[in-house]
Amino acid sequence: MKYGIVGYSGRMGQEIQKVFSEKGHELVLKVDVNGIEELDSPDVVVDFSSPEALPKTVELCKKYRAGLVLGTTALKEEHFQMLRDLSREVPVVQAYNFSIGINVLKRFLSELARVLKDWDVEIVETHHRFKKDAPSGTAILLESALGKSVPIHSLRVGGVPGDHVVVFGNIGETIEIKHRAISRTVFAIGALKAAEFLVGKDPGMYSFEEVIFGGE
């Protein structure tokens, strides 16, 4: 598979290159704030950079008829409209979190929330000091799995890749469910699965849950 990275020189960009290269995939498109290096036509473009970069990413996907794996957070309606328009021409996977564990947790939370519908629920999320958006896209994703609005507490400290704790409480007992990303590698592994999934797919919007669970 030939692939491109938007945000190539960033921390996630470097992690993505490492994981993809270990599987023998060829980096043929590099995009960062310093410019664009186009070596060949990519099958898939991976973007974990910023919302401001999305117009250029969409332009490149259309130019090369390349699928898009998008892990950028803090997206607005205008960005989702760009993705919907792009998905008429190429396959797209957009997710706020490409950790397989988080997406398994999301499915589990939906069932737990149904059973514990009368319990109090709150979410605590912790990320590195450089993360700009709060609450995190992942916390919002987990909240959506609960099926209702709940308090979300955001901490920005040190170099934490990502901790999410969902706390259910009732009189006399609590349940805490925690997911911890040990390193950014987990997100790059998820991006790889999504990229390989997109190769040969018809145009359209695909969820990361479809990548993981298929038609289940």
Curated annotation (Swiss-Prot):
One example GO MF annotation? oxidoreductase activity, acting on CH or CH2 groups, NAD or NADP as acceptor
Q: Where is the catalytic site? A: 127 (proton donor/acceptor), 131 (proton donor)
Please verify whether the record's keywords include Lipid metabolism.
Answer: no
Gene3D superfamilies in the record = NAD(P)-binding Rossmann-like Domain
Q: Does the keyword NAD apply?
A: yes
Q: Where does (S)-2,3,4,5-tetrahydrodipicolinate bind?
A: 128, 137-138
Catalysed conversion reaction? (S)-2,3,4,5-tetrahydrodipicolinate + NAD(+) + H2O = (2S,4S)-4-hydroxy-2,3,4,5-tetrahydrodipicolinate + NADH + H(+); (S)-2,3,4,5-tetrahydrodipicolinate + NADP(+) + H2O = (2S,4S)-4-hydroxy-2,3,4,5-tetrahydrodipicolinate + NADPH + H(+)
Major location (coarse)? cytoplasm
Q: Where is the protein localized?
A: Cytoplasm
One GO BP on record is: lysine biosynthetic process via diaminopimelate
The record's EC number reads 1.17.1.8
Q: Which CDD domains match?
A: DHDPR_N (cd02274)
Q: Where is the signal peptide?
A: none
Name the domain of life.
Bacteria
An annotated GO cellular component of this protein is:
cytosol
Amino acids binding NAD(+) = 7-12, 71-73, 95-98
Keywords (A to Z) from UniProt: Amino-acid biosynthesis, Cytoplasm, Diaminopimelate biosynthesis, Lysine biosynthesis, NAD, NADP, Oxidoreductase
Q: Please list the coiled coil stretches.
A: none
> Pathway it acts in?
Amino-acid biosynthesis; L-lysine biosynthesis via DAP pathway; (S)-tetrahydrodipicolinate from L-aspartate: step 4/4
The record's section on InterPro entries has: DapB_C, DapB_N, DapB_N_CS, DHDPR_bac, NAD(P)-bd_dom_sf
Family the entry assigns:
Belongs to the DapB family.
> What role does it play?
Catalyzes the conversion of 4-hydroxy-tetrahydrodipicolinate (HTPA) to tetrahydrodipicolinate.
Q: What is this protein called?
A: 4-hydroxy-tetrahydrodipicolinate reductase
Record the organism.
Thermotoga petrophila (strain ATCC BAA-488 / DSM 13995 / JCM 10881 / RKU-1)
